[in-house]
Amino acid sequence: MIMSNLWILTLISTILAVFAAVLIIFRRRISASTTEWPVGPKTLPIIGNLHILGGTALHVVLHKLAEVYGSVMTIWIGSWKPVIIVSDFDRAWEVLVNKSSDYSAREMPEITKIGTANWRTISSSDSGPFWATLRKGLQSVALSPQHLASQTAHQERDIIKLIKNLKDEAALNSGMVKPLDHLKKATVRLISRLIYGQDFDDDKYVEDMHDVIEFLIRISGYAQLAEVFYYAKYLPSHKRAVTGAEEAKRRVIALVRPFLQSNPATNTYLHFLKSQLYPEEVIIFAIFEAYLLGVDSTSSTTAWALAFLIREPSVQEKLYQELKNFTANNNRTMLKVEDVNKLPYLQAVVKETMRMKPIAPLAIPHKACKDTSLMGKKVDKGTKVMVNIHALHHTEKVWKEPYKFMPERFLQKHDKAMEQSLLPFSAGMRICAGMELGKLQFSFSLANLVNAFKWSCVSDGVLPDMSDLLGFVLFMKTPLEARIVPRL
C-alpha cells in the first residue's frame, strides 16, 4: 500500500515538474518575441486554444471567434506556436498583396514532407529561386494560354464521355447518379495531357491516380491534427497516417516513374521539369502536386455547384435558359470551352459557388520571412499568419445575406470591397498557380452538365447535405447523389 502511494506521488510530482518546465519555456518564448500579438481568446496550459477549436469546421469556428475578438486575432495552437488569424479584407490584402513578399514563407506539418519531396513543391516550399522557377515553369509551359487553347478539342470530347457515363449510370439506377468520381476522372485526363502531352484513353492510369488521391484524402485529417496540436504526432492514429503517407508515396512513384524515361513534347510540364535537371523525387512530386490540387478542387467545386442548383431550382432554370438560348442562337447542342466567358449568369453562378464554398476556406498558412508589420504593429520573422477566406466571403458588411446562394449579386454593380473579398484562389505572389485552368474547367463542366440534364433530389424533400469537411480542399461531407433527366 505504501509503495502504491509512493508510486502515485512520484507520478504526480513528475507530471507537475513537466508542467512547470513547459510553462517556463512558454513564458520565455513569449518574452523573447517582439511581435505585438493581437488580442485573442484566453489560453489553457499545454493545449492553448485547442479546447475551443472543435465542434464544427475550423474556418467556421475562427469566423465566430473573430466576431468576438476582432478581425485580426491571435490563436494559440497546442504547441504554443501562435497564429495570427486575419478575417478582414483590408488586412488580408495587406498580408497577401501589399506585403506579399514579407509573408511568402511556408510552415507545413511534418507529415507533408513525405508527399512533397521534403517540401520541394510549389505549394509547400518557401518563396525563393527554386519556388519561382518551378511555378513559372508550370504557368508558362503547361498552363500557358496557347497550351490550354490546344486542349479544347480534348476537353469537349471528355465532356461528351462524361455525359455518356452519367446517362449509363442513371439508366442502371432509376435515374440516380453520383457525379463526383466521373468529374474527378475527367480532370485527371485533362491534367495528364498537360503534364505528359499524351492522351489517356486507357482508364488504368486514370483509375490508379484517382485511387491514390482518394487514399491520401482519407488520411489528410491526421496531417491537420498534427498541424493544430503538436503532440498528435505521438498518437497511434498519427503514426498510422505516416505509414499511409509512405504507402501513398510508393504508389505515386510507381505510377509516375515510367513516364520519366519518355521524351515528352517541349510544351509539356514533364519536359520543363526534366530540363531543370531536378532530382527524380522532385519531378515526381511536382507532377503529383498538379493532380492533388487540381483534381479535387475542380471536381468538388462542380459538385458543390450542382448541389446548390438542386436546392435552388429557380436558379437552375434561369441558368438553363441562358445556356439553351445561347446554344440555339449558335446552332449547336453543346457548349464549347470558348463559350463560358460569354455567359454572364453562368459566371455569376460560378462566382457565387466559389464564394459560398471556397476551395480552401483557410488559406495555406503564410509565414513572415523577415521582420515586418501588420496594421502598423511589429511582426517578427517566423510568425505564422492565416487568412480565413470563409470569413472574407461571409462578412455581412460586404455581402448582403451572406449565407444565401444568390448569383444575382454578381450581376449588379458592386464595390471594391466585394472584389477584394472574393479570394477563392487566395491572392498575391502565392495565388493558386492553376487558377485560370480551374475556373475554366469548372465553368465548362457545369455549363454542359446543366445543359444536358435537369438535376433534382434523389427523393422528394431530401435536399443535398451541404455540410463540409476540410481536407486538401473543401469536400462535401456526404458526396452528392442526384436524380437526372436528360434534356438533350
From Swiss-Prot:
InterPro entries attached to this UniProt entry: Cyt_P450 (IPR001128), Cyt_P450_CS (IPR017972), Cyt_P450_E_grp-I (IPR002401), Cyt_P450_sf (IPR036396)
GO BP annotation list: isoquinoline alkaloid biosynthetic process
Reactions catalysed: (S)-tetrahydrocolumbamine + reduced [NADPH--hemoprotein reductase] + O2 = (S)-canadine + oxidized [NADPH--hemoprotein reductase] + 2 H2O + H(+)
Transmembrane region(s): 6-26
Domain of life, source organism: Eukaryota
Alphabetical keyword list: Alkaloid metabolism, Heme, Iron, Membrane, Metal-binding, Monooxygenase, Oxidoreductase, Transmembrane, Transmembrane helix
Protein's membrane topology: Single-pass membrane protein
Cofactor(s) this protein cannot do without: heme
Protein name (database record): (S)-canadine synthase CYP719A21
Gene: CYP719A21
